[in-house]
Amino acid sequence: MFSRAGVAGLSAWTLQPQWIQVRNMATLKDITRRLKSIKNIQKITKSMKMVAAAKYARAERELKPARIYGLGSLALYEKADIKGPEDKKKHLLIGVSSDRGLCGAIHSSIAKQMKSEVATLTAAGKEVMLVGIGDKIRGILYRTHSDQFLVAFKEVGRKPPTFGDASVIALELLNSGYEFDEGSIIFNKFRSVISYKTEEKPIFSLNTVASADSMSIYDDIDADVLQNYQEYNLANIIYYSLKESTTSEQSARMTAMDNASKNASEMIDKLTLTFNRTRQAVITKELIEIISGAAALD
């Protein structure tokens, strides 16, 4: 006679192949579900890459004339050798980003540069105020530098920037009531499709430009003309930085989505191989059970 323990062990041994089969079927369902999800994600990343490529082509075309005007405006400060007075302490720091992500380290590189500049200027005894162009830079810096934010601009990056947008930003800065002595604008300069560089360019207030020693040689420039030119110059530099940042962002997003699509393809290949191996194991096991059962009947 069989003992209860022996019968229990026999029952467990008999049911074990069924449990293995159920587990393998569950694994196949999980793999199928993951494959479907990754394929859907790959469709999205490929579509985003195509959209970014179209926007990048337009941004690169519009960057060339904007770069000429921007570098021309910055040339005034270089050729006139305008420098901020040492005894003045008010410094304005402008960071250019956008409202959209999925573009690599575009926004974090700007935030990193701004944090470094804030630390350096604060250690030198300067009063630093921040301006964020784009919601991403505000989101990164606001938690640690909320008391230093002068103004933040949203709705940036959804459409190609225009000179009108830059003029609105420049006018808002001039009407903010903060009379800075000198400042800097930090943005990503476009270099190639796969490369960009975080750059910092100087900006100066009207009083700083008017009181510069090199400006005294221009006797025929009155205050109104200089003020109008300085306002236009500020808008021009902001427009130039927006165009550089937009082109860098679209190229970085195109590269990021291309890498994401390639990674999705690799995952699909690996999961497909795993699915085929698991399915083959299930089929082989079922054949073994059928053959074993037929042999037992004989």
Swiss-Prot record:
Which residues are reported to carry the modification Phosphoserine?
Answer: 146
Q: What InterPro entries does the database record attribute to this sequence?
A: ATP_synth_F1_ATPase_gsu (IPR035968), ATP_synth_F1_gsu (IPR000131), ATP_synth_F1_gsu_CS (IPR023632)
**Transit peptide (residue range):** 1-25
Which tissues and organs express this gene's product? Isoform Heart is expressed specifically in the heart and skeletal muscle, which require rapid energy supply. Isoform Liver is expressed in the brain, liver and kidney. Isoform Heart and Isoform Liver are expressed in the skin, intestine, stomach and aorta.
Q: Which domain of life is it from?
A: Eukaryota
Compartments it resides in = Mitochondrion inner membrane
Molecular function terms, GO-annotated: proton-transporting ATP synthase activity, rotational mechanism; RNA binding
Supply the alphabetized keyword list. Answer: Acetylation, ATP synthesis, CF(1), Hydrogen ion transport, Ion transport, Membrane, Mitochondrion, Mitochondrion inner membrane, Phosphoprotein, Transit peptide, Transport
An annotated GO cellular component of this protein is: mitochondrion
Which residues are recorded as modified (N6-succinyllysine)?
49, 115, 154, 270
Q: Biological process GO annotation list?
A: ATP biosynthetic process; oxidative phosphorylation; proton motive force-driven ATP synthesis; proton motive force-driven mitochondrial ATP synthesis
PTM sites of type N6-acetyllysine: 39, 55, 115, 154, 197
Topology in the lipid bilayer is annotated as: Peripheral membrane protein
Family from the record? Belongs to the ATPase gamma chain family.
Which function does this protein serve? Subunit gamma, of the mitochondrial membrane ATP synthase complex (F(1)F(0) ATP synthase or Complex V) that produces ATP from ADP in the presence of a proton gradient across the membrane which is generated by electron transport complexes of the respiratory chain. ATP synthase complex consist of a soluble F(1) head domain - the catalytic core - and a membrane F(1) domain - the membrane proton channel. These two domains are linked by a central stalk rotating inside the F(1) region and a stationary peripheral stalk.
Q: How does it assemble?
A: Component of the ATP synthase complex composed at least of ATP5F1A/subunit alpha, ATP5F1B/subunit beta, ATP5MC1/subunit c (homooctomer), MT-ATP6/subunit a, MT-ATP8/subunit 8, ATP5ME/subunit e, ATP5MF/subunit f, ATP5MG/subunit g, ATP5MK/subunit k, ATP5MJ/subunit j, ATP5F1C/subunit gamma, ATP5F1D/subunit delta, ATP5F1E/subunit epsilon, ATP5PF/subunit F6, ATP5PB/subunit b, ATP5PD/subunit d, ATP5PO/subunit OSCP.
User: Could you identify this protein by its name?
Assistant: ATP synthase F(1) complex subunit gamma, mitochondrial
Recorded source organism is: Homo sapiens
